[in-house]
Design a protein with these regions (language model features):
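Acidic/aromatic-lined carbohydrate-recognition and catalytic surfaces
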Residues: 1-155, 159, 172-223, 233
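Hydrophobic residues within beta-strands of alpha/beta enzymes
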Residues: 19, 165-167
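Noncatalytic carbohydrate-binding groove/subsite architecture in carbohydrate-active enzymes
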Residues: 211, 219-259
Length: 259
Protein backbone atom coordinates (compact mmCIF):
# COMPACT_ATOMS: atom_id res chain seq x y z
CA UNK A 1 0.00 0.00 0.00
CA UNK A 2 2.89 2.36 0.69
CA UNK A 3 4.28 1.58 -2.74
CA UNK A 4 0.99 2.57 -4.37
CA UNK A 5 0.95 5.82 -2.39
CA UNK A 6 4.46 6.61 -3.59
CA UNK A 7 3.28 6.36 -7.20
CA UNK A 8 0.23 8.62 -6.88
CA UNK A 9 1.89 11.65 -8.48
CA UNK A 10 2.95 9.55 -11.45
CA UNK A 11 -0.56 8.12 -11.76
CA UNK A 12 -2.03 11.61 -11.55
CA UNK A 13 0.25 12.73 -14.40
CA UNK A 14 -1.09 9.83 -16.47
CA UNK A 15 -4.63 11.12 -15.96
CA UNK A 16 -5.73 8.36 -13.59
CA UNK A 17 -8.72 9.30 -11.44
CA UNK A 18 -9.63 5.87 -10.06
CA UNK A 19 -7.51 3.00 -8.79
CA UNK A 20 -8.90 -0.52 -8.58
CA UNK A 21 -7.08 -2.43 -5.86
CA UNK A 22 -7.37 -6.20 -5.98
CA UNK A 23 -7.97 -7.89 -2.60
CA UNK A 24 -5.52 -6.98 0.14
CA UNK A 25 -7.62 -8.29 3.02
CA UNK A 26 -6.49 -10.98 5.44
CA UNK A 27 -6.27 -14.18 3.42
CA UNK A 28 -4.49 -17.55 3.27
CA UNK A 29 -3.67 -16.60 -0.35
CA UNK A 30 -4.92 -19.80 -1.93
CA UNK A 31 -6.41 -17.70 -4.73
CA UNK A 32 -4.37 -14.49 -4.76
CA UNK A 33 -6.47 -12.91 -2.03
CA UNK A 34 -9.84 -13.83 -3.50
CA UNK A 35 -10.19 -16.19 -0.55
CA UNK A 36 -10.99 -13.57 2.08
CA UNK A 37 -10.68 -14.50 5.75
CA UNK A 38 -11.49 -11.03 7.13
CA UNK A 39 -13.21 -8.31 5.11
CA UNK A 40 -12.28 -5.49 7.46
CA UNK A 41 -8.59 -6.03 8.10
CA UNK A 42 -5.52 -5.79 5.92
CA UNK A 43 -3.15 -8.67 5.37
CA UNK A 44 0.20 -7.68 6.91
CA UNK A 45 1.96 -8.59 3.66
CA UNK A 46 0.38 -5.47 2.13
CA UNK A 47 0.67 -3.05 5.03
CA UNK A 48 -1.46 -1.64 7.82
CA UNK A 49 -4.72 0.22 8.22
CA UNK A 50 -2.66 3.36 8.77
CA UNK A 51 -1.03 2.79 5.38
CA UNK A 52 -4.44 2.46 3.78
CA UNK A 53 -5.83 5.56 5.48
CA UNK A 54 -2.83 7.47 4.18
CA UNK A 55 -3.34 6.12 0.66
CA UNK A 56 -6.99 7.17 0.67
CA UNK A 57 -6.15 10.64 2.00
CA UNK A 58 -3.30 11.20 -0.46
CA UNK A 59 -5.48 9.97 -3.29
CA UNK A 60 -8.21 12.44 -2.39
CA UNK A 61 -5.68 15.30 -2.53
CA UNK A 62 -5.04 14.34 -6.15
CA UNK A 63 -8.67 13.56 -7.01
CA UNK A 64 -7.87 9.87 -7.30
CA UNK A 65 -10.53 7.61 -5.83
CA UNK A 66 -9.97 4.05 -4.68
CA UNK A 67 -12.14 1.16 -5.82
CA UNK A 68 -11.98 -1.95 -3.66
CA UNK A 69 -12.51 -5.53 -4.81
CA UNK A 70 -15.36 -7.17 -2.89
CA UNK A 71 -15.44 -10.97 -2.98
CA UNK A 72 -18.99 -11.65 -1.83
CA UNK A 73 -19.81 -14.96 -3.52
CA UNK A 74 -17.65 -16.88 -1.07
CA UNK A 75 -15.26 -16.57 1.84
CA UNK A 76 -12.14 -18.43 2.79
CA UNK A 77 -12.75 -21.49 4.92
CA UNK A 78 -10.42 -19.71 7.36
CA UNK A 79 -13.03 -16.99 7.88
CA UNK A 80 -14.48 -16.86 11.40
CA UNK A 81 -17.97 -17.50 10.04
CA UNK A 82 -16.93 -20.77 8.45
CA UNK A 83 -14.87 -21.88 11.41
CA UNK A 84 -17.87 -21.32 13.66
CA UNK A 85 -20.03 -23.25 11.22
CA UNK A 86 -17.65 -26.21 11.42
CA UNK A 87 -17.73 -25.91 15.21
CA UNK A 88 -21.45 -26.68 15.08
CA UNK A 89 -23.04 -23.23 15.35
CA UNK A 90 -26.31 -23.46 13.42
CA UNK A 91 -26.42 -19.72 12.78
CA UNK A 92 -23.15 -19.80 10.86
CA UNK A 93 -23.93 -23.04 9.09
CA UNK A 94 -26.79 -21.10 7.50
CA UNK A 95 -24.27 -18.51 6.30
CA UNK A 96 -23.05 -21.13 3.84
CA UNK A 97 -24.60 -23.86 1.71
CA UNK A 98 -24.44 -27.16 3.55
CA UNK A 99 -26.48 -29.96 2.04
CA UNK A 100 -26.81 -33.67 1.43
CA UNK A 101 -25.98 -36.90 3.17
CA UNK A 102 -22.72 -38.87 3.49
CA UNK A 103 -23.27 -41.24 0.59
CA UNK A 104 -22.82 -38.77 -2.29
CA UNK A 105 -22.57 -35.04 -3.15
CA UNK A 106 -25.89 -33.18 -3.48
CA UNK A 107 -25.26 -32.65 -7.21
CA UNK A 108 -22.68 -33.60 -9.83
CA UNK A 109 -21.59 -30.00 -10.36
CA UNK A 110 -17.94 -29.32 -11.03
CA UNK A 111 -15.80 -26.65 -9.42
CA UNK A 112 -14.37 -24.04 -11.78
CA UNK A 113 -11.00 -25.03 -10.36
CA UNK A 114 -11.54 -28.72 -11.12
CA UNK A 115 -13.13 -31.64 -9.31
CA UNK A 116 -16.42 -31.68 -7.46
CA UNK A 117 -18.03 -28.42 -6.36
CA UNK A 118 -18.86 -30.09 -3.04
CA UNK A 119 -16.63 -30.96 -0.08
CA UNK A 120 -17.72 -33.37 2.62
CA UNK A 121 -17.44 -32.44 6.30
CA UNK A 122 -17.52 -35.65 8.30
CA UNK A 123 -18.17 -33.93 11.63
CA UNK A 124 -21.39 -32.44 10.26
CA UNK A 125 -22.37 -35.26 7.92
CA UNK A 126 -22.95 -32.71 5.16
CA UNK A 127 -21.30 -31.21 2.10
CA UNK A 128 -20.57 -27.53 1.49
CA UNK A 129 -20.65 -25.85 -1.90
CA UNK A 130 -17.51 -24.30 -3.36
CA UNK A 131 -17.82 -23.18 -6.97
CA UNK A 132 -14.13 -22.30 -6.90
CA UNK A 133 -11.32 -23.64 -4.71
CA UNK A 134 -12.17 -26.07 -1.92
CA UNK A 135 -11.05 -23.36 0.52
CA UNK A 136 -13.61 -20.90 -0.89
CA UNK A 137 -17.00 -21.78 0.58
CA UNK A 138 -20.00 -20.20 -1.16
CA UNK A 139 -22.12 -17.86 0.93
CA UNK A 140 -25.86 -18.35 1.31
CA UNK A 141 -27.33 -15.13 -0.04
CA UNK A 142 -30.85 -16.36 0.69
CA UNK A 143 -30.07 -15.72 4.34
CA UNK A 144 -30.89 -12.05 5.11
CA UNK A 145 -28.29 -12.06 7.90
CA UNK A 146 -25.59 -12.81 5.33
CA UNK A 147 -26.75 -9.97 3.12
CA UNK A 148 -26.72 -7.61 6.10
CA UNK A 149 -23.21 -8.69 7.08
CA UNK A 150 -21.98 -7.88 3.58
CA UNK A 151 -23.76 -4.53 3.57
CA UNK A 152 -21.92 -3.70 6.78
CA UNK A 153 -18.64 -4.42 5.00
CA UNK A 154 -19.56 -1.90 2.31
CA UNK A 155 -20.58 0.67 4.93
CA UNK A 156 -17.31 0.16 6.78
CA UNK A 157 -15.14 0.90 3.74
CA UNK A 158 -17.45 3.64 2.51
CA UNK A 159 -16.94 5.42 5.85
CA UNK A 160 -13.19 5.12 5.28
CA UNK A 161 -13.49 7.13 2.09
CA UNK A 162 -13.56 4.42 -0.57
CA UNK A 163 -15.14 5.73 -3.78
CA UNK A 164 -16.02 2.58 -5.69
CA UNK A 165 -16.50 -1.17 -5.50
CA UNK A 166 -15.78 -4.01 -7.88
CA UNK A 167 -17.79 -7.16 -7.14
CA UNK A 168 -16.14 -10.46 -7.95
CA UNK A 169 -18.22 -13.07 -9.86
CA UNK A 170 -21.29 -11.28 -8.54
CA UNK A 171 -23.68 -12.90 -10.99
CA UNK A 172 -23.18 -16.25 -9.22
CA UNK A 173 -24.51 -15.19 -5.81
CA UNK A 174 -28.09 -16.41 -6.34
CA UNK A 175 -28.30 -20.18 -6.22
CA UNK A 176 -31.25 -22.24 -7.53
CA UNK A 177 -34.35 -23.19 -5.58
CA UNK A 178 -34.03 -26.81 -6.72
CA UNK A 179 -30.69 -28.61 -6.67
CA UNK A 180 -30.30 -31.02 -9.55
CA UNK A 181 -27.60 -32.76 -11.54
CA UNK A 182 -26.31 -31.34 -14.81
CA UNK A 183 -25.89 -34.18 -17.28
CA UNK A 184 -24.85 -31.86 -20.12
CA UNK A 185 -22.35 -29.55 -18.43
CA UNK A 186 -20.63 -28.62 -15.19
CA UNK A 187 -23.66 -27.14 -13.43
CA UNK A 188 -23.15 -23.49 -14.31
CA UNK A 189 -26.49 -23.23 -16.10
CA UNK A 190 -28.19 -23.72 -12.72
CA UNK A 191 -26.36 -21.02 -10.77
CA UNK A 192 -25.31 -18.38 -13.32
CA UNK A 193 -27.54 -15.27 -13.26
CA UNK A 194 -29.73 -16.97 -10.66
CA UNK A 195 -33.36 -16.23 -9.80
CA UNK A 196 -32.77 -13.47 -7.24
CA UNK A 197 -29.48 -11.96 -8.40
CA UNK A 198 -31.01 -8.69 -9.58
CA UNK A 199 -33.07 -8.38 -6.42
CA UNK A 200 -29.97 -8.95 -4.28
CA UNK A 201 -27.92 -6.38 -6.19
CA UNK A 202 -30.64 -3.73 -6.01
CA UNK A 203 -30.93 -4.31 -2.27
CA UNK A 204 -27.16 -4.14 -1.71
CA UNK A 205 -26.76 -0.90 -3.66
CA UNK A 206 -29.86 0.76 -2.22
CA UNK A 207 -29.27 -0.13 1.42
CA UNK A 208 -25.62 0.95 1.39
CA UNK A 209 -26.26 4.18 -0.50
CA UNK A 210 -23.77 3.56 -3.28
CA UNK A 211 -26.08 4.37 -6.19
CA UNK A 212 -23.76 7.18 -7.28
CA UNK A 213 -20.53 5.27 -6.68
CA UNK A 214 -18.55 3.52 -9.38
CA UNK A 215 -19.65 -0.11 -9.15
CA UNK A 216 -18.33 -2.82 -11.42
CA UNK A 217 -19.52 -6.39 -11.65
CA UNK A 218 -17.39 -9.24 -12.90
CA UNK A 219 -19.71 -11.49 -14.89
CA UNK A 220 -18.89 -15.18 -15.13
CA UNK A 221 -20.37 -17.23 -17.99
CA UNK A 222 -23.13 -14.69 -18.55
CA UNK A 223 -24.71 -13.29 -21.71
CA UNK A 224 -24.40 -9.84 -23.23
CA UNK A 225 -28.13 -9.38 -22.64
CA UNK A 226 -27.63 -9.92 -18.93
CA UNK A 227 -24.69 -7.50 -18.90
CA UNK A 228 -26.92 -4.82 -20.39
CA UNK A 229 -29.51 -5.40 -17.67
CA UNK A 230 -26.97 -5.39 -14.81
CA UNK A 231 -25.57 -2.05 -15.95
CA UNK A 232 -28.77 -0.40 -17.17
CA UNK A 233 -29.40 2.95 -15.46
CA UNK A 234 -33.04 2.13 -14.85
CA UNK A 235 -32.15 -1.06 -12.96
CA UNK A 236 -30.04 0.77 -10.34
CA UNK A 237 -27.68 -2.16 -9.87
CA UNK A 238 -24.19 -1.57 -11.29
CA UNK A 239 -22.41 1.24 -13.12
CA UNK A 240 -20.76 -1.21 -15.47
CA UNK A 241 -19.75 -4.82 -15.83
CA UNK A 242 -17.16 -6.80 -17.69
CA UNK A 243 -17.40 -10.22 -19.24
CA UNK A 244 -15.07 -12.58 -21.03
CA UNK A 245 -16.68 -13.00 -24.43
CA UNK A 246 -13.75 -11.35 -26.22
CA UNK A 247 -11.37 -13.94 -24.79
CA UNK A 248 -13.22 -16.75 -26.53
CA UNK A 249 -12.76 -15.62 -30.12
CA UNK A 250 -9.77 -17.92 -30.61
CA UNK A 251 -10.99 -20.91 -28.58
CA UNK A 252 -10.56 -24.13 -30.51
CA UNK A 253 -13.88 -25.99 -30.47
CA UNK A 254 -14.79 -24.06 -27.34
CA UNK A 255 -11.72 -25.29 -25.45
CA UNK A 256 -9.55 -22.59 -23.90
CA UNK A 257 -6.68 -24.97 -23.14
CA UNK A 258 -5.83 -25.88 -26.76
CA UNK A 259 -3.80 -23.77 -29.19
Amino acid sequence: LRGVAEKLDYLKDLGVDYLWLTPFFVSPQRDNGYDVADYRNIDPMFGTMEDLDNLIAEGEKRNIGLMFDMVFNHTSTSHEWFRRALAGEKKYQDYYIFKGAPDQPPTNWQSKFGGSAWEYVSSLGKWYLHLFDVTQADLNWKNPEVREELKEVIRFWKAKGVKGFRFDVVNLISKPEIWEDDFEGDGRKFYTDGPYVHEYLKELVRDTGIEDYVTVGEMSSTTLEHCIRYSGAEEKELSMCFNFHHLKVDYKDGNKWEL
